[in-house]
């Protein structure tokens, strides 16, 4: 039934069930006259069996299935392009009404991470990030966020890839906290035992620091938090991240600390992301400034070698400089890692996502 659904001919009154978390799905099913336990049954079909055909949901009454068909549908936008890196990273592109988003799967020995997008484009215009240079189109719906995970799991199963998705990171296109309501709703589905069932410690939301939204987030959901800091002081951050002129480092870290005190998912500390830009933010003095800045913030630091794209005149810090920077932080007592570049050859690495089709390999 739904395998070849024409999304443009669906009545506006119909609801895509991928837009509903468990609570909202329960209210919807009750409005159809279904029993309470039907909620878990429907979610199991959707998220365990990836079923988009109500006729196949045989443990649900015919009456309820008929009403579901009349009032709702299940639709996950399919990937239209796939690129596979030499290191096993896979990048998928989704077309949503002629606008593109990208999703990246990164397999490792002990885990497999899916990087999802929360917006089409991004309004923050961080100078070192390709997504921001493409401009902002719109927020993704809950169903469009969930569809990335849904389709990724289906695609991995089709490929007989046995490495299940163990971690999900909101580090793709867009600023998650500028799509707060939909991102939080999607997160509840990701964490729900009848949804994707991931642990909150295995789900990470990365933000540039939208302070009012971050303050709200701590009362909405508990997941691992990453702060895209990228500078040891406001002077540098103002230059490379224009959002800092609105929410400066002090306000961002203050809000992050409040989230940490609320959270159980961040016991090991908040992740501080720091892109390494040659002669901009990578000096020994910058490392010392960063250590002072974070001295009262329970944190672990992830240094990110800058991934190039056409446009900016940045250079990535060389390996020796990155190692020196990391060692200074380690000597100051900070857990410091250097991110391994994944998928750089297919423009799937951190800061390279644009949603532009390049015809490397089409589905």
Swiss-Prot record:
InterPro entries assigned to the protein according to its UniProt record, in alphabetical order: Aldolase_TIM (IPR013785), Methyltransferase_A (IPR040072), RlmN_N (IPR048641), RNA_MTrfase_RlmN (IPR027492), rRNA_lsu_MTrfase_RlmN/Cfr (IPR004383), rSAM (IPR007197)
> Keyword annotations for this protein?
4Fe-4S, Cytoplasm, Disulfide bond, Iron, Iron-sulfur, Metal-binding, Methyltransferase, rRNA processing, S-adenosyl-L-methionine, Transferase, tRNA processing
Predominant localisation class: cytoplasm
Q: What class of enzyme is it?
A: transferase
Recorded GO terms, molecular function?
4 iron, 4 sulfur cluster binding; metal ion binding; rRNA (adenine(2503)-C2-)-methyltransferase activity; rRNA binding; tRNA (adenine(37)-C2)-methyltransferase activity; tRNA binding
PROSITE patterns tied to this protein: RADICAL_SAM
What is written in the cofactor note of this entry?
Answer: Binds 1 [4Fe-4S] cluster. The cluster is coordinated with 3 cysteines and an exchangeable S-adenosyl-L-methionine.
GO cellular component, alphabetical, reads: cytoplasm
Task: Domain (Radical SAM core): give its ranges.
Answer: 108-344
Cofactors named for this entry: [4Fe-4S] cluster
Query: Which Gene Ontology BP terms does the record give?
Result: rRNA base methylation; tRNA methylation
NCBIfam families, per database record:
rRNA_mod_RlmN
Q: What does this protein do?
A: Specifically methylates position 2 of adenine 2503 in 23S rRNA and position 2 of adenine 37 in tRNAs. m2A2503 modification seems to play a crucial role in the proofreading step occurring at the peptidyl transferase center and thus would serve to optimize ribosomal fidelity.
Assigned protein family: Belongs to the radical SAM superfamily. RlmN family.
Q: What is this protein called?
A: Dual-specificity RNA methyltransferase RlmN
Which organism is this protein's natural source? Buchnera aphidicola subsp. Acyrthosiphon pisum (strain APS) (Acyrthosiphon pisum symbiotic bacterium)
